Amino acid sequence: MALLDYTRRAMLAAGTATAIALSAISVTAQTPDDVLVVGQIAEPKALDPAAVTAVNDFRILMNLYDGLVRYKDGTLEVEPALATSWNISNDGTEYTFSLRQGVKFHDGSDFNADAVKFNFDRMLDEAHPYHNTGPFPLSFFFSAIVSVDVLDPMTVKFTLNAPYAPFLSNLAYPTGLIVSPDAVAKHGTDFGRNPSGTGAFKFGEWRSNEAVVVEANSSHWEGAPKLQAVVFRPITDANTRTAEMLAGGIDMMVEVPPVALSKFQGDGYTVHEQAGPHVWFLILNAKEGPFSDVRVRQAANYAINKEAIVNDVLEGTAAVAAGPTPPAFAWAYNNSLEPYPYNPEKARQLISEAGADGAELTFFVTEGGSGMLDPVAMGTAIQADLQAVGLKVNIETYEWNTFLGEVNPGLEGKADMAEMAWMTNDPD
């Protein structure tokens, strides 16, 4: 899987997550009717779309920025946004975009072909004067780009090193959102705290550990949004988030714990569910420790009762994954694949063969993030299953952004395994 480097391996724990969000029909939060208060699972890492990887951040960024293209609502089909049309060369290596006229960034600067070139050069060219405003962890989405050329003020051409089918889809992903070059030049490495895009909402304020506020952009090219503002509140504890929703402190919450859904069955709430291209998995440190032996990695997959996690922890809001491609990609999904069966006896046998009886494992678990609906409960269930076959598992729990700081660079020297989730727009 693209998320992993070669020193780690992934074991699928549960897949095909159902995204769950909850909204109150009768708004009781102490805010005006045209202000929406959203309960998020964590503080955003940054508000620079090229520098972040988490859905928690993307949820804010999609309001602040536009891309050249975007996904049609509820689909992975691409439609125009800041680009009104495009042509693809016969050999599939050149994409020429005609840009939307008259669009301005929130800071008043012009959106044009130079701005588009700036955005992709900043990510991909190490010699670019603002490449140091990264790192850009998902820049590999655009690694096929050889050059970005300005043909005229409102026409830009991308040249690829080979035909690349997901290119348009990747442009629609949040990593492809277009930022203001002037704002990057002004704020440098602090741009992520001072964002400027072309989106339907503009940045209002960021009160650390309290709220990010975005305000209506009355000059948006699609017209002013109906809401005057959206307030994103980081509420890391799921029980607290649920209590805030019940008390009217927030109007909408995301990543609703499955065990809490029964509290919101009344007429005052609407539950929104949608199956998506989301896979939850375990990262295993295959470079050192017990998981450097393939038999122990296999044993872990046999030991974990994934059906029980789906049914008892996640209340049926997920399905057991058979591989890294979720069924949401119907055209790319192999229905003949079978997941590892639950077989603790086989797990014990493999652990014994590997001489790993009683091995101690450090397991990083996040309090919430990346669409995982109940990661602590999932982690506890995984811990119990592994301990039942002779492995000693010590859980270390982290707030989401702290967790990313520990896990994304790799687990070597720190842990043996970690929970993680991945949502993608492309099955490859």
Predicted regions located by residue number:
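Ligand-site clamp/hinge motif
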Residues: 189, 217-263, 380, 392
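Ligand/substrate-recognition segments at binding pockets and active sites
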Residues: 208, 330, 352-425
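Aromatic- and charge-enriched surface segment that lines or borders ligand/interaction sites
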Residues: 84-129, 157, 290-292
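N-terminal lobe/hinge region of extracytoplasmic solute-binding protein
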Residues: 39-90, 121, 128, 196
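Surface-exposed binding/hinge segments that line
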Residues: 98, 117, 135-182
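Structural transition elements
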Residues: 320-353, 369-377
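Gly/Pro-rich hinge or "lid" segments in bacterial periplasmic/extracellular proteins
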Residues: 72-73, 164-225, 229, 239, ...
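Periplasmic-binding protein-like
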Residues: 168-171, 257, 263-264, 287, ...
